[in-house]
Amino acid sequence: CAAGPALEGMNIQQGMRGETGAIEDVEIRPDGIHLKVIGGGPAEGICGSGILAGIKELLRCGVLRKSGAFVHPDRLPEGDARKEYLQVNPEDGTRSVRLQENPVLVNITQKDIRQVQLAKGAIRSGIEILLENNGLDPSMLDEVMIAGQFGSHLLPEDLTGVGILPEEVRDRIHYVGNTALTGAVAALLSEGVRREMEALAKEIGY
């Protein structure tokens, strides 16, 4: 689905894996944009957790509309600090937000926002269908489990802030690690687990 590439830094203009040089968190304060970069040095790009955090902050401070479109700098009051990082390309009019200027220019572009919207749609629609098919609403969920090594780096406030997960489950999100690896090891070591997996596979619909 669309979620993997966008949230792992692919299809993002300056996306990269979660390694040294990747922006992993973004905070917008009155004095400007503050970045958390893996390794502590200057940013070389942005990884999945960084793009989610950035979008959540842009929504919170009013630079990004709920539709996913950037506001135009001309619509902001004179002297507004947000004009310092909200940019418009003079050639085609496209808008972006500058996270870092030197030594490497790192932006969040309108296209990046669209990629994350596709990811959000893929995940959220699956959640909504599961809830509807079982007669549930988000407030009735006891727990939401986030699997995978990458998933453990996604903060609850970012997942709910951009709408990937419903706001009602923010305090019920738990991280369960690399369940694919755990399941593979269990299947190799236990015939009973393999039989259980085969039985479950026959019951699962899609």
Q: Could you tell me what each predicted segment is?
A:
Residues 1-50, 155-177:
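Glycine-rich phosphate-binding loop of actin/hexokinase-like ATP-binding domains
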Residues 23-31, 127, 134-139, 181, ...:
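Non-transmembrane, aqueous-exposed alpha-helical and coiled segments at domain scale
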Residues 43-64, 147, 152:
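Conserved phosphate/anionic-ligand binding catalytic regions in large, soluble enzymes, centered on
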Residues 59-134:
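A contiguous, well-structured pocket-lining segment that forms one wall/lid of small-molecule binding clefts
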Residues 110-119, 164-186:
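Glycine-rich and small/hydrophobic secondary-structure elements
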Residues 124-138, 154, 162-168:
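Hydrophobic alpha/beta core scaffold segments
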Residues 138-157:
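Glycine-rich phosphate-binding loops at beta-strand->alpha-helix junctions
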Residues 186-206:
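Acidic, glycine/GT-rich loop-and beta-edge segments that sit at the periphery of enzyme/chaperone cores
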